[in-house]
């Protein structure tokens, strides 16, 4: 017996020694609306930036922007789409934020990015300094915090 692969996954299992087929409904394909993704991502980023007390230059560096005009346009009216680079940067910022909220209580989480850090990765510098260096710095800080949480970085 054949089942349509368009609507269902087919799974074969044994029941009392014989094969038994059953259908599992396939989830409907989803697409992310680039405009909704941009709005949600930047709205969340700007809230985190306010909580971390980042100035415009720091926010621009984290977003990978060189144009102040673009930055302030984004703050005033969110763009209709974001580049893959910007989405990756946002993902790392959100991961860092989540880890800090898990590891540290309240205001300590927000202040962590500004405080000098004795861990070898930071060499006595604040994590923010490494984060401002680009995607690689964001990745390293996120991986460090994921390790501190005891989780794997994925």
Predicted feature residues:
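Non-transmembrane "mature" sequence context
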Residues: 1-154
């Amino acid at each position: 017996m054949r089942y349509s692969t368009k609507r269902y996954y087919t799974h074969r299992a044994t029941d009392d020694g014989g094969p038994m087929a059953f259908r599992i409904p396939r989830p409907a394909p989803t697409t992310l609306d680039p405009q909704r993704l941009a709005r949600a991502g930047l709205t969340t980023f700007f809230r985190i930036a306010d909580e971390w007390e980042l100035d415009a230059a720091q926010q621009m560096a984290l977003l990978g922007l060189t144009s102040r005009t673009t930055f302030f346009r984004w703050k005033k009216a969110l763009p209709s789409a974001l580049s893959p680079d910007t989405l990756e940067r946002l993902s790392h910022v959100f991961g860092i934020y989540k880890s800090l909220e898990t590891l540290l209580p309240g205001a300590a989480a927000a202040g962590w990015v500004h405080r000098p850090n004795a861990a070898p990765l930071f060499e006595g510098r604040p994590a923010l300094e490494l984060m401002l260096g680009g995607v690689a710095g964001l990745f390293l800080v996120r991986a460090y915090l994921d390790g501190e949480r005891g989780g794997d970085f994925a």
